[in-house]
Amino acid sequence: DAITEFIDTTKEEGIPVDGFQLSSGYCAIETEEGIKRCVFTWNKKRFKDPKDFFAQMKKRGVCVSPNVKPGILLIHPKLEEMKAKGMFVKASETEEPGIGTWWGGQGMFVDFTSQETRDNWKEMLKENVLNYGTSSVWNDNCEYDSMVDKDCRCSFEGKGGTIGQLKSVMSNIMCQISNEAVHETFDNTRPYVVCRSGHAGIQRYAQTWAGDNLTCWDSLKYNIATILGMGLSGVANQGCDIGGFYGVSPEAELLVRWIQNGIFQPRFSIHSTNIDNTVTEPWMYSNCTEYIRTAIKFRYRLFPYLYSLMERAHETGLPIMEAMCSAFQNDPKCYEEGVDFMFGDSLLVANVVEKGAKTRKVYLPEGNTFYDFYTRTPYNGGQTIELPVDLGSIPLFVKGGAIIPMASNQMKNLMTEQPAGISILCAPDCDGSFTLYEDDGVSMDYEKGCYLKTFVSMTAGERTVLTFKQEGSYATSVETMALDMIHREKAPYWVTVDGKEIPHFLHRRKFEEAECGWYYSQTLKSVQVKYLNPKKDHQVVVSFEQFDLIGM
């Protein structure tokens, strides 16, 4: 009830939510040595009916990821059964299982390098977790570091090996099994697996995060560097425990700044075990809740852009949060930067990460034009600028050539809502391109062609042309299209959609009331275009050509 109440409160506060990562307290049961956390068991006082719990969360549009660990306490009720099946890493000098330190005492550790063990673990996962109604798993504490004797022996597919040699593969295999178990339990369902650790290739099976971080300002900065480094290593689907995991509760300013950075992380999760008996919640400081609400809602507006970047990472391995030295390899000054990053190819993010900051210095890479996301103020690259900031500031810059699709409607839950319209922010200083990706988000149908890729190409010039070409059979939810085209020099002469000139409005209110047309915003120095989504290949032409006033 406390968890469903938390989700309901989040919705009442107007804060979007889609997932809940269920910590291992759900499997804290009464044993001979007191309350202990035993994987694949349920505390029936806290969860009288696990199946109903998952059903209630699904009804609220929330995906639950239960915590699963590979260590088995010596007082675990299933220990002897697992031991008899030979599921554990063996001691270095005997045929008995090796023993190491675990949560709440001594424990044995599952050997995932054995096919028989993998099959048994998969069945236990299905029977004790997935069959209750979740297609998500949170694999945790799978580094095997607490096995002090690194000569403990693993099967290694019958060839033999030591845990010292093989511990790095355990988390990858554990996540692979989790994916297989979901596919075997649910028809046509996309697994969602989260894992704290892994070696090269973990991105094939799981989303990862930067571990149990300390709640402090330094961690905020270090976590950004960690995520950027993981992106350079091919692990794009990454994040951190926002607000800090361990320590006293975050002060208000730190929490706001962490969330403002977290909205750009592929994995956004506020997660804590505060030592002052508090819980980190987005509304814990009432005077800051609006800043937090605004930031998280902005993440949901960016969903079409982020989801497309996720698909790009899936296909190519390219980062979502990209280090400046990677995005601008020919600019030596970008090799000195460890906090700013590119969010995709089009957005430069310069979060405020210093306590009490009143200004923020930002280096803009040379050879590019950048625009303030909010004011559209232009800046030439190759210079450091200094901006005034307050607690609500999230400094963002649009790179010349940018194409950034955003949701026109404000969604608060992606399981129950979809983008009704797409608004594309673009900056035609130069040519640009972007692939907008859509699918149902939950099934495996995308493997059968049930997706929609819209290849958007922009040719800049006196006649700026945006061409939309589609691939795939997915039926989009998008009914309206809008363009927000930065063009400070002058307004257009005319705008066409598929060769047909659309109405020009001189008054903003009349433009807003119309279904189709264009308007030039003097405030933003931007061309605003909107039209019904043709749901097919089409072209938009915006003419900035000189025209004859007498001829008008």
What is each residue range found by the language model?
Residues 111, 372, 439, 512, ...:
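Acidic/polar residues at beta-strand termini and the immediately following turn/coil
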Residues 398-500, 509, 521-523, 529-536, ...:
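Accessory, solvent-exposed terminal regions and/or long lumenal/extracellular loops of proteins
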Residues 378-390, 504-535:
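Short, surface-exposed beta-strand/turn "edge" patches of beta-sheet domains
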Residues 29, 73-75, 202, 358, ...:
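Intrinsically disordered, low-complexity acidic/polar segments
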Residues 356, 382-384, 534-539, 544:
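Solvent-exposed, conformationally flexible loop/turn segments
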Residues 1-393, 399:
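Catalytic-domain carbohydrate-binding cleft regions of carbohydrate-active enzymes
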Residues 191, 341, 347, 394, ...:
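A broad, low-specificity signal marking well-ordered, structured residues that form hydrophobic/aromatic
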